[in-house]
Amino acid sequence: MQLSDFDYHLPEALIAQHPPAERGASRLLHVDGMTLSDLSFADLPSRLQAGDLLVFNDTRVIRARLFGEKASGGKVEALIERVLDDHTALAHVRASKSPKPGSRLIFAGRWEAEMVERHDSMFKLRFLAEENVYDILEASGKLPLPPYIERSAEHDDDERYQTVYAREQGAVAAPTAGLHFTDAMLATLQAQGIATAFVTLHVGAGTFQPVKVDNVAEHKMHSEIYDIPQATVDAIAAARARGGRVVAVGTTSVRALESAARHGELKAGRGETDIFITPGYRFRVVDRLLTNFHLPKSTLLMLVSAFAGYDEIFQAYRHAVEKEYRFFSYGDAMLLEKKV
């Protein structure tokens, strides 16, 4: 397929720049083949049944953006992509001139780091303070909002750009389908007999990288680290045994689960995945998908087209634009039925 096959018109006014006034006060578009239902997110429990299993991504967004200057002069900005150990990290670095190995960077006027070496488009940084990287980010980092949110991070984002169940540090972007859930909604689902389980996939900045090839099959996917607990594998098996459906909350949960089942049976464990899901892919684990609306020509739009059907998704997106749904990270949600 061609990249142009995944384009659509989106008025800029529909890109949500702020979260809704209250967490969960979003709309929900249910896509069941060509049948569309306009709902509120509060209606989600009515679309699930006892015995179903919701699988959430419990990654936590780190304050990954650091501002500073090179020891030799000139401003520098670093986006920490992956923490390697207590004192080293891979980062995207923006500066008037790329730092050379051995050069020093000083962030927030207090944290010195050495540029060790280059890794493709990223830089390996070694922080020289006694504090570990996570402590440095917590003290001086800024939350890395997506590039289409055209404002700086505000105090409110510290809470609203995290899910209520986030616990495993390491993401530089939120698993946004989960942002709609409140503690009250989770309690309602539990009382209804709907089970929950967790995976971890640390969302990287690559999730926002544009596809630069015309032939989609030639795209090289970014890689991300994931972890599937044995308890989640067991919960999925139990849901299958009782006739329940596996409902992935977000495309990141899909990528983690489908990666862990790439060779057939779903297996627990930690790994790195560059799985690229496009129309024609056969889903092994996920039965239903809760997700937000995705960017034109993006790999995530390709994933949902593979899941719910290309024609079905593009009809749903045209409907969403017409009905003025809110798009992207702070926008509204969709509940997708798998096309079989």
Curated annotation (Swiss-Prot):
Membrane spanning stretches: none
Top-level enzyme category: transferase
Subcellular location: Cytoplasm
UniProt xrefs under InterPro entries: QueA, QueA_dom1, QueA_dom2, QueA_sf
Any one GO molecular-function label of the UniProt entry: S-adenosylmethionine:tRNA ribosyltransferase-isomerase activity
Catalysed reactions, semicolon-separated: 7-aminomethyl-7-carbaguanosine(34) in tRNA + S-adenosyl-L-methionine = epoxyqueuosine(34) in tRNA + adenine + L-methionine + 2 H(+)
Example GO BP: queuosine biosynthetic process
Coiled-coil annotated residue ranges, if any: none
Family: Belongs to the QueA family.
Quaternary structure (record): Monomer.
Protein's name in the database: S-adenosylmethionine:tRNA ribosyltransferase-isomerase
Organism: Chromobacterium violaceum (strain ATCC 12472 / DSM 30191 / JCM 1249 / CCUG 213 / NBRC 12614 / NCIMB 9131 / NCTC 9757 / MK)
Organism placement in taxonomy: Bacteria, Pseudomonadati, Pseudomonadota, Betaproteobacteria, Neisseriales
Gene: queA
